[in-house]
Amino acid sequence: MLHNPAGAASVLILGDSLSAAYGMQESKGWVQLLRDEMPSVEIINGSVSGETTAGGLRRLPSLLDSATPDVLVIELGGNDGLRGFSPKQLKSNLTKMIELGQSNGATVLLTEIMVPPNYGPRYSQMFNQVFHDLADDYDVALIPFFMTVIAPQADLMQRDGIHPNEAAQPKITQWMKPWISEAVTNAD
């Protein structure tokens, strides 16, 4: 965790392996690269590899209590999708996380998540629609899924074909930074 002077804006990133620097040193992950680019902002990485929305929801209250972030970035849902969890349960968990963040005074950003096409068009569409519906219902910014530009480039992916590699991290940082910067500016 990075500590900044009192009064500095703070951002909590609640994510899964895509934000937890899976398969590399944490210092090489996009969240640390973002810290390096935004030194006046306290960026707390509450991401855990393998995390589902249910796990994130369980951990969020204590993270909000200890961090009191100005901005909450929710990058969860991928593991729910890969496990074929119900879009209804996904929506319920994400709804509660958004409401928790907002009731604690945080500006919430929701990262869109998509599942691979082999899960079938109906499930894929229902799953993805959850993110769009929640962004509309709760008036939160929906950050387009960064993996749509990373995953098609084999040289940016780890051998498992699921996780972005170290070379992808600066690209993810540049994808996420404008959204987070704007939210921090508007939270002041």
Please name every model-derived segment.
Residues 2-52, 59-68:
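Serine-esterase "nucleophile elbow" of acetyl-processing enzymes
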Residues 33-38, 57-188:
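Alpha-helical cap/lid subdomain in secreted, periplasmic
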